[in-house]
Curated annotation (Swiss-Prot):
One of its GO terms (biological process) is translation. GO terms for cellular component: cytoplasm; small ribosomal subunit. GO terms for molecular function: rRNA binding; structural constituent of ribosome; zinc ion binding. Binds 1 zinc ion per subunit. Part of the 30S ribosomal subunit. Contacts proteins S3 and S10. Binds 16S rRNA, required for the assembly of 30S particles and may also be responsible for determining the conformation of the 16S rRNA at the A site. The lineage of its organism: Bacteria, Thermotogati, Thermotogota, Thermotogae, Petrotogales. It comes from the Bacteria. This is Small ribosomal subunit protein uS14. Its cofactor is Zn(2+). Zn(2+) binds at residues 24, 27, 40, 43. The keyword Metal-binding applies.
């Protein structure tokens, strides 16, 4: 779980747009965040397997 201070800090609008970075909406993780869903890879996988993300299915080949 991410530190509360860093999560709150990321919610503020920065002075410069380039300082902005994406965080997971669920857990606040700063790395491996999918822009389209706003989720990190771990939360994305959990929600996709539960069927909470429409149009996403597990690949098999």
């Amino acid at each position: 779980m991410a530190k509360k201070a860093l999560i709150e800090k990321s919610k503020r609008t920065p002075k410069y747009k380039t300082r902005e970075y994406s965080r997971c909406k669920v857990c606040g993780r700063p790395r491996a965040v999918y822009r389209e869903f706003g989720l990190c890879r771990i939360c994305f996988r959990e929600q996709a397997l539960e069927g909470k993300l429409p149009g996403v299915k597990k690949a098999s080949w």
